[in-house]
Amino acid sequence: MQVILKEKVENLGVLGDIVNVKPGYARNFLIPFGKAVQATQANIKAFEAQKAELEKAEKARFEAAVAVADAIKDKVYTIAAQAGEGGKLFGSVGTAEVAEAVSNQSGKKVEKSQVRMPEGVIRSVGEFEFTVHVYTDVDADIKVNVVAAEA
């Protein structure tokens, strides 16, 4: 199925590209989430008329994402968690806790789905590095310091 992309989609294309995708991917993901429209002659003409304003909106989203990334990157965020002897945590610190700490301490909204934890959840105290995937092609590297909470 051919679709016209209305925004940049990772591993697929950029705004305005006409790409071939499997019908299920188009019907269940791209079209319902407003990332693409079916590539009919009428939609191609309508897209050409809207292309300038879509590019402007895409640029605004990208610039906002860069501003968020610049505000949160290269900083150390502290999370207090219950820990036992030897620095082992009772439970773990996951993406939700990291996103909440970054949002609270930086003042910028970060969703838990944007936090990338390649090593998995944190189960001990210490300093850890993560990547926050703010937007397509916009990442921010952060450090999280997990400390034992005062009883």
UniProtKB/Swiss-Prot annotation:
Q: Which GO molecular function, any one, fits this protein according to its record?
A: structural constituent of ribosome
Would you say which domain of life the source belongs to?
A: Bacteria
Q: Give a GO cellular-component term.
A: ribosome
Keyword list (alphabetical) reads: Ribonucleoprotein, Ribosomal protein, RNA-binding, rRNA-binding
Matches recorded under SUPFAM superfamilies:
L9 N-domain-like (SSF55658), Ribosomal protein L9 C-domain (SSF55653)
InterPro entries in the record:
Ribosomal_bL9, Ribosomal_bL9/RNase_H1_N, Ribosomal_bL9_bac/chp, Ribosomal_bL9_C, Ribosomal_bL9_C_sf, Ribosomal_bL9_N, Ribosomal_bL9_N_sf
Disulfide linkages recorded for this protein, renumbered to the chain, are: none
Instruction: Note the PROSITE patterns from the entry.
Output: RIBOSOMAL_L9 (PS00651)
Instruction: Tell whether Cytoplasm is among the UniProt keywords.
Output: no
Give the protein's biological function: Binds to the 23S rRNA.
**Annotated NCBIfam families:** L9 (TIGR00158)
Spell out the family assignment given in the record's similarity comment.
Answer: Belongs to the bacterial ribosomal protein bL9 family.
- Official protein name in the record: Large ribosomal subunit protein bL9
- Source organism per entry reads Francisella tularensis subsp. novicida (strain U112)
What gene is this protein translated from? rplI
